[in-house]
Structures are given as C-alpha cells and as structure tokens.
C-alpha cells in the first residue's frame, strides 16, 4: 500500500511540475520524436474529452466516486493502482485548483481517434494503471 501511495504522489508531483513548466514557457508548441509526439497545450474545461460539460465543482464528487469504485473493484495495491490513483487525483487537483485541465500531448501519427485527441501525463498514467489492473486480475 505504501508503494501505491508513493507512485500516486510521484505522478501527482510530476504532472503538477509539467503544467507549471508549460505555463511558465507560455504554452510553447513543438514536435518530439520526429513528429510522432507533439506538445500542443489546450485547456479543457469539460470532462471525458469535453463530452461532459460540467464545472470543476460538479466533477469533483464524480471523479472521487469513480476513482473509489475503480480501486474497490480492482484493488488498492501495486503499480497499476498507484498510476490510476495518481492520474485521477492529478486531473481532479487541476480542476479544483485551476477550474480546468491543461491537456498537452498529441500523437499525430496514431491511428483513428487517438490522433485527434490531446492528453496529459495524468491521463496516460490513469489509462496505463487501469490496463495494468485489468491484466493483473486476468492472470489470477
């Protein structure tokens, strides 16, 4: 459980630092990895890729309930739980602190919908954590 909390804290801290750095550098845009990854900052006030037009205060209890339900279902231990918890709390913190999330990662050469969306490290940590939890559960 301590490892899970440490991973979650590391994700939360890293995501906060990246946001701070992007805002200090005036939301610069640039390509990385030969154009396979693009830094393209975009403020997101909604949720679920802006499919849910809810305010930060409306999203907070929903986010906490969803995190709690996922962790109760899949477990509170391990790397997957730490990544899921850290990613979820990072997005929640940004919504409460700033009223919106700063999405900044694009993958222009990815297939389908993946190339049209903009992500954060928090979202990637959340999705990777969820995938690890599902894989761990299937191995049992």
Predicted region positions:
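Alpha-helical transmembrane bundles and membrane-interface segments of multipass inner-membrane proteins
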Residues: 1-140
